[in-house]
């Protein structure tokens, strides 16, 4: 499964985006994430809509990738900005097609929550 959304972001560059996208900030940026149980910069544990999960944070050339390494669907979320464009991309993938409608809806809500969070950082 793959979802891609874009958010207008004329006031946010890659450096500020990377600084905002920390594990500790996840509950503030995405309402589907309830709290951070542990944060060790590049890895941590969160409690979210899908329960407790280990999360990894990887710095990319133009953004950040969060992955859920123990998730049975290998969910990843990349949030990137091309400084030549005034848009932030929110890209979510799983390692297989998802047929469970409730899970699909929860992923769609996860992305909607990220859009809201990114918009608050941009303004």
Language model regions located:
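Hydrophobic-ligand-binding modules of eukaryotic lipid transfer/binding families
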Residues: 1-6, 89, 99-102
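Hydrophobic ligand-binding cavity/cleft-lining segments
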Residues: 1-44
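Short, highly charged low-complexity linear segments
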Residues: 8-12, 47, 78-84, 109, ...
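Short, low-complexity, polar/charged sequence segments that are solvent-exposed and flexible
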Residues: 24-29, 64-68, 84-87, 108-113
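A short, polar/proline- and glycine-enriched secondary-structure boundary/capping micro-motif
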Residues: 29, 57, 76-79, 100-105
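Hydrophobic-ligand binding "helix-grip"
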Residues: 44-85, 93-95
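N-terminal secretory/membrane-targeting helices
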Residues: 86-91, 121
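A conserved amphipathic terminal alpha-helix motif
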Residues: 95-123
């Amino acid at each position: 499964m793959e979802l891609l959304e874009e958010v207008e972001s004329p006031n946010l560059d890659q450096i500020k985006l990377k600084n905002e996208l920390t594990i500790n900030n996840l509950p503030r940026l995405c309402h589907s994430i309830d709290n951070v149980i542990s944060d060790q910069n590049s890895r941590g544990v969160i409690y979210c809509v899908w329960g407790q999960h280990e999360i990894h944070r990887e710095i990319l050339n133009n953004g950040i990738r969060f992955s859920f390494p123990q998730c049975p669907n290998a969910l990843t979320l990349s949030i990137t900005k091309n400084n030549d464009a005034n848009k932030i991309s929110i890209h979510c993938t799983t390692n297989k097609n998802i047929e469970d409608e409730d899970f699909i809806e929860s992923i769609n809500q996860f992305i909607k929550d990220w859009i809201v969070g990114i918009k608050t950082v941009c303004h």
